[in-house]
UniProtKB/Swiss-Prot annotation:
Protein name per UniProt: Pre-mRNA-splicing regulator female-lethal(2)D
Keywords assigned by UniProt, alphabetized: Coiled coil, Developmental protein, Differentiation, mRNA processing, mRNA splicing, Nucleus, Sexual differentiation
Pfam families assigned: Wtap
Membrane-crossing residue ranges in chain numbering: none
Length: 560
């Protein structure tokens, strides 16, 4: 079977075997094949019955195999015995040729495979060579770069070395610098101190060495033994004394600690009590301050009222003196008892004329008993207070329009002095007493100022419980109580100078709008819408308490 007639499956094991075969073995196989072919040819030509060597892949069977394969045909052999030797020779020759051709084909195929392998190896080697060349070029380039860097580093190193040398040369002290350092007083002082310390240490060292040499003794000496025994005894005594002192000190310290603890507890208690007391004192002080503030405000209001009353009294005295001078002049009439009409009072005169002193009014009545000229209508006109819907209306007598127009100025002035009308408020309850000698009725337009204390926290344990502060609600209650008391007492709106003594002191203090009752006996209360006088009850109550204390009575209780 030739190589061309073999399939690819048959050729693949041969190719694998030749790929694995080495070059020396391949040449050895070729030599064996050539030698076997030559020996087979020579044997076939001489003997004609030799068995040629079979190749590794010869598919044709040999002569012996054919004899074994056909034992059951004996009838063919004795029919063709005369043709057998020639045919066997030809067959052997053909087999040898085929074997030679197969060997040659195998050798050619192996050579071709080897050539292909070598070509592939050459290509790979070329590629490897190119790659190695590139690697070598890169390595050379890196080497050059590193060499350049190394040169730069060496240059920098040399520069640094030269700089260090220069710095050392600069820092090296010269002889002149050393001399100046030695001449420096601070350095000299330092050297002197070092010398003194060195001398002192040397002397101490010598002393200690001398003492050590003096105290040295041998172990067998009696002096050393006695000294050691004495030292042990002293050491034991020292330990015992230390224990005793430590125990005694501990007990003492424990007692002192207990005493300090008890003292600290007492101090804490006293401090807490002191804090409570201080808090109470603060509350009491706040209450006192509020009370003082309220009293100061009341004092201020009373002083203001006193000043205004003094001014009013001075004005009234001046007006009274003028009236006396006018009244002393003889009145002129037209032959009748009718008086000339008085002039209408101006607002300026009305504002200036206010309550008149009682003594001055009495003196004027005693000096001039006939100053009314026998006309009782003027008394009624002065005593009666007509109700008016408009507050501050000027009330004039009925005979203003019917009076004689021929009266002179002196008569008008006298009449004006005797029949002066004042500004009054509207009243609902009108009290008309029996006709008495009239006094000048003057009404003072005063306003009751109510001062309320600031609201503060009530003290816990205040000692000022007898003097609590007043609030607006308490003031209203006191005013209401004073109004009820004043309503029970029939106080006329127009009082005569002689009737003022019939009113009790407390009722007049409640009913009067001002403090004029303290200074004079004339009382001219202010009329309200209800006909009840609403005076400053707080001030009157305090005045009553002051009078009661002066008379021997107890203080007034403000707590109700």
């Amino acid at each position: 079977m030739s190589v061309a007639a073999m399939t690819m499956d048959d050729q693949r094991p041969l190719m694998n075997s030749y790929d694995k075969m080495s070059t020396a073995k391949y040449e050895q196989n070729i030599n064996l094949i050539s030698s076997g072919a030559s020996s087979g040819i020579s044997a076939g030509g001489v003997g004609g019955g030799g068995v040629p060597p079979s190749g590794p892949a010869s598919p044709t069977p040999s002569g012996s195999e054919e004899s074994h394969h056909h034992p059951h045909h004996p009838h063919h052999s004795h029919h063709h015995q005369h043709h057998t030797p020639n045919q066997e020779q030809q067959r052997q020759q053909l087999q040898q040729q085929e074997q030679q051709h197969a060997a040659v084909a195998e050798a050619v195929a192996a050579a071709e495979q080897r050539q292909r392998l070598l070509e592939d190896e050459i290509e790979t080697l070329k590629l490897e060579q190119v790659r190695m060349g590139q690697i070598c070029a890169d390595a050379q380039r890196r080497e050059k770069i590193l060499m350049r860097r190394l040169a730069n580093k060496e240059q920098e190193f040399q520069d640094y070395v030269s700089q260090i040398a220069e710095y050392k040369a600069q820092q090296a002290p010269t002889a002149l610098a050393l001399r100046t350092a030695l001449l420096d007083p601070a350095v000299n002082l330092l050297f002197e101190r070092l010398k003194k310390e060195l001398k002192a240490t040397k002397t101490k060292l010598e002393e200690t060495q001398n003492e050590l040499s003096a105290w040295k003794f041998t172990p067998d000496s009696n002096t050393g033994k006695r000294l050691m025994a004495k030292c042990r005894l002293l050491y034991q005594e020292n330990e015992e004394l230390g224990k005793m002192t430590s125990n005694g000190r501990l007990a003492k310290l424990e007692t002192e600690l207990a005493m300090q603890k008890s003292f600290s507890e007492e101090v804490k208690k006293s401090q807490s009590e002191l804090d409570d007391f201080l808090q109470e004192l603060d509350e009491d002080v706040e209450g006192m301050q509020s009370t003082i503030l309220f009293l100061q405000q009341e004092l201020k209001t009373t002083r203001d009222r006193i000043q205004t009353l003094e001014k009013d009294n001075a004005q009234l005295k001046q007006a009274h003196t003028k009236d006396d001078t006018v009244a002393m002049a003889p009145p002129t009439t037209n032959g009748t008892n009718k008086m000339s009409p008085p002039q209408t009072p101006t607002p300026s005169t009305i504002g200036k004329l206010e309550p008149i002193d009682e003594n001055v009014a009495l003196e004027s009545k005693a000096a001039h008993p006939d100053y009314l000229n026998g006309d009782t209508r003027s008394v009624n006109n002065n005593e009666q207070i007509l109700p008016s819907s408009v507050p501050g209306e000027h009330i004039l007598p009925d005979d203003v329009n019917n009076s004689n127009s021929n009266g002179n100025g002196n008569g008008n002035a006298a009449r004006l002095a005797r029949k002066r009308n004042y500004e009054e408020e509207t009243t609902t309850n009108m009290v008309t007493p029996t006709p008495t000698p009239v006094s000048y009725s003057v009404e003072e337009m005063t306003t009751v100022r109510e001062v309320s204390t600031p609201r503060i926290l009530p003290p816990k344990k205040s000692k000022l419980r007898g003097m609590p502060t007043r609030r607006s609600s308490q003031l209203e209650e006191e005013l209401h109580a004073a109004a009820t008391v004043a309503a029970t007492v029939a106080t006329p709106l127009i009082l005569d100078n002689s009737a003022t003594g019939m009113v009790s002191e407390e009722a007049t203090a409640v009913a009067q709008p001002t403090l004029a009752s303290v200074e004079s006996g004339a009382v001219c209360p202010e009329s309200t819408e209800a006909g009840v006088v609403a005076g400053p009850a707080r001030i009157s109550t305090r005045r009553r308490s002051v009078r009661m204390q002066q008379n021997g009575a107890g203080p007034l209780d403000y707590s109700t």
